Amino acid sequence: MDLTSVLSLETWVLLAISLVLLYRLGTHKYDIFKKQGIPGPKPLPFLGNVLNYYKGIWTFDIECHKKYGKIWGLFEGQRPLFTVTDTEMIKNVLVKECYSIFTNRRDFGPVGIMSKAVSISKDEEWKRIRALLSPTFTSGKLKEMFPIIEQYGDILVKFLRREAEKGNPVTTKEVFGAYSMDVITSTAFGVSVDSLNNPKDLLWKGRKLLRFDFFDPLFLSVVLFPFLIPIYEKLNVSMFPKDSISFFRKFVDKTKENRLDYNQKHRVDFLQLMMNSHDNSKDSHKALSDMEIIAQSIIFIFAGYDTTSSTLSFALYLLATHPDVQKKLQEEIDIALPNKARPSYDKVMEMEYLDMVLNETLRLYPIGSRLERVCKQDVEMDGVFVPKGSIVMVPVFALHYDPQYWPEPEKFRPERFSKENKGSIDPYIFLPFGNGPRNCIGMRFALMNMKLALTKVLQNFSLQPCKETQIPMKLSRKAMLQPEKPIILKVVPRDAIITGA
């Protein structure tokens, strides 16, 4: 049947007008960059540029940086992203105008009680929570926590030794995921969990928190249609798995009750330090509420578990595939800790080459591949008009691979971070933990934890590639930076003396 004979001319005209109006509805915001002469990839109606992310957000960002230069425009749905790589503009966003204009991160969807977490909260609420949490991460508090973390380094060494004796290669993410969970639960809650040898609910619930993908239907729906967020909130829909949140909420509540019953104010874990804020706060309304304490506790797990285990996995892969670097680092460790002496906080943090290796790992594999801030008011920045509600995005991964700042950026060269070279590194180009007042609050804790783990492992073992090791390693296309295939390495004992065994 011929449609032209069935539908009248008026119907065809109405249909054509409807399609034009639909197209205009899906593209009417897309001229914001064109009017200002800002380049960028062409967006699709309603979708914007999100389909470009399928190849990997970091790959897409590198391509755009090469093609468009220091500033370009993207759209996620119809929301504009001003992408900047100019260091002065980055400094303005992350530091100078942090408190006035670029205070908040974007809404990533309905999050329930997690809206109280320090990394998600906004404006004055964020300032208050951040101020109360900051004393938890002083060098003095970290030194007190160091012996707690070291005992899990001993457990890690014992586990690796058993696997080495059996001739089993190890899947690094699984091993360091369990190690990270144990360290977090002990330092955050004072609870001893041996996830390496007895994986239980705590580890699995923690893993479930991290199953995040940009193309998850719920996440994609709020990116394309932000007006759905309050609707989801009213329906009690959350980006975080309900069973995991419920599990950790009960876990924190029970731990808190035990503390109150036995008056354990002397403890140095994060939970106790947060509980003590009730007593230490001069103004009662400034103290952390019970709900805020639960949110911070869960975000410690969410933020600390994957970042630490992934970075350690990447570091050991790089060391296994660069035996000269591994040997040099082992020599530094042996000199600092002769006869396999037990590490101390000061000794670990003073090791220069260890710091260089870890920084170069974080350059090559920054777990947070982007930094984003929401513009709270219309503002002109370096001649560019940024309207209220827009997102200003810093493509960290692309900056870390920019040959203008890093010669042969794809190569693993710890010497980039030597004393001689470190002074020339722009702090707004190397951004593994962000910068400014809203940088990663747990940065010092994470660095201490990772340095201790590397020290314990390399004191006792050498890492080698095996037949299961993917060389060269390819990155997954998922939102969280991770390898396409699990990193699997052979662990070889350095000698018969194993500390912590």
From Swiss-Prot:
Expressed constitutively in liver. InterPro entries: Cyt_P450, Cyt_P450_CS, Cyt_P450_E_CYP3A, Cyt_P450_E_grp-II, Cyt_P450_sf, Cytochrome_P450_3A. GO terms for molecular function: heme binding; iron ion binding; oxidoreductase activity, acting on paired donors, with incorporation or reduction of molecular oxygen, reduced flavin or flavoprotein as one donor, and incorporation of one atom of oxygen; testosterone 6-beta-hydroxylase activity. Heme binds at residue 440. Keywords: Endoplasmic reticulum, Heme, Iron, Membrane, Metal-binding, Microsome, Monooxygenase, Oxidoreductase. It catalyses: an organic molecule + reduced [NADPH--hemoprotein reductase] + O2 = an alcohol + oxidized [NADPH--hemoprotein reductase] + H2O + H(+). The keyword Protein biosynthesis does not apply. The keyword Cytoplasm does not apply. One of its GO terms (biological process) is steroid metabolic process. This is Cytochrome P450 3A31. It comes from Mesocricetus auratus. The gene is CYP3A31.
